[in-house]
């Protein structure tokens, strides 16, 4: 006998089934790729894309939305784009580009997206932070009053750099710009300053050599290397500087000191020009886009010395009473010494001073090839170590007078005694400012050398023996006056007792003639 269902049971059953149906609506913004060329994708139908948003493409590929037009979005692909095709689906993610940050990046080599490329396995525990961030406001900043020792006599004496400063290193190719930056990184190994070295558009072999040199000098442990090699896309070369800055800001925000080197911003500007032209943005001077100044200003303004209140607010009270700093050393390559080109003038106007390296000086054997006349540090003077500040005034004057007189001396047949003495002193100062690569010099040894030349102790030393004399003098002091050297290195102070000790022991050393 067939089972009969009454109408009420049927309606109850239907009601139960309807209640059990799970309908989950998902809102997704999708578009279609209409063209792919030279790393640029054009996407039709993405109505709600944001400027700088990550766009998801097939095979876990991402693009960065840069052009928001009326009916399409122009985006630059981060990585390989050979597998992308017209008609592919593109989705908005609602996120802007972020990179990993944290102490586990120290000692590692990563690409522009923060992925390790050194073969040492995955990164340790990290957080992520956006690559683009608004620079700290005026209220949160503090004046620069602590030094960053580069280990170079010529820089620390005449063009001092402070923590939180932006100091440009500018010069033609092969004048020692990268060498100066790497030596500065090596000099920070006992100072607690964390370093970030961003290599933009360099050969992979060059970056490998730099990493090896940092390892040999025990400097890789406090350094993050961000590499966007010449073989990588223009998008990654453009982003790498901002990614490196974000990694450096992690330390600044937590009341620590960090140093970042951008090597070099000329190549970043070229990469950005390439992207802009491919996106059909109108070209300006030297075919650069109109916002190339903003490209560098928004990057370099993120370098700052921030107040205790900023650090306390950022860490939500975990870190108190500590200031943080991010010091930037951007590098710019000039063509035939032309500092009046578009990008060099932009960066000179943004930074707090520049170290100008000259080809003629480099070829003459004066290395580092610093042109003391047009190199300047606008804020570093207030951060200079007391002893170096006291002694270095004479160095600049001696060099300036020497350069001026040397030009006249070529035409003069006979020189008076005063002029001849100034020329001879200038020759010895110039010789003393020479320094080999990877030979960082402590504050005490710099002070000793500067004091010796200022007080005329090198006047009777032949010019070709000046560096030998200096080396022997440092060895003599480290053997006989190690307590004095340690005291100066620790405090950086200058007083009558130190002056008397310098005078007495330099005179003693000269009588031995051991140089």
UniProtKB/Swiss-Prot annotation:
ATP binds at residues 171-178. GO terms for cellular component: plasma membrane; proton-transporting ATP synthase complex. One of its GO terms (molecular function) is proton-transporting ATP synthase activity, rotational mechanism. It is a peripheral membrane protein. Belongs to the ATPase alpha/beta chains family. NCBIfam families: atpA, PRK13343.1. The gene is atpA. The keyword Transmembrane does not apply. Keywords: ATP synthesis, ATP-binding, Cell inner membrane, Cell membrane, CF(1), Hydrogen ion transport, Ion transport, Membrane, Nucleotide-binding, Translocase, Transport. It catalyses: ATP + H2O + 4 H(+)(in) = ADP + phosphate + 5 H(+)(out). F-type ATPases have 2 components, CF(1) - the catalytic core - and CF(0) - the membrane proton channel. CF(1) has five subunits: alpha(3), beta(3), gamma(1), delta(1), epsilon(1). CF(0) has three main subunits: a(1), b(2) and c(9-12). The alpha and beta chains form an alternating ring which encloses part of the gamma chain. CF(1) is attached to CF(0) by a central stalk formed by the gamma and epsilon chains, while a peripheral stalk is formed by the delta and b chains. It is an enzyme of class 7 (translocase). InterPro entries: ATP_synth_asu-like_sf (IPR023366), ATP_synth_asu_C (IPR000793), ATP_synth_asu_C_sf (IPR038376), ATP_synth_F1_a_nt-bd_dom (IPR033732), ATP_synth_F1_asu (IPR005294), ATPase_a/bsu_AS (IPR020003), ATPase_F1/V1/A1_a/bsu_N (IPR004100), ATPase_F1/V1/A1_a/bsu_N_sf (IPR036121). Its main location: membrane. The record marks 375 as: Required for activity. Its EC number is 7.1.2.2. It is found in: Cell inner membrane. This is ATP synthase subunit alpha. Produces ATP from ADP in the presence of a proton gradient across the membrane. The alpha chain is a regulatory subunit.
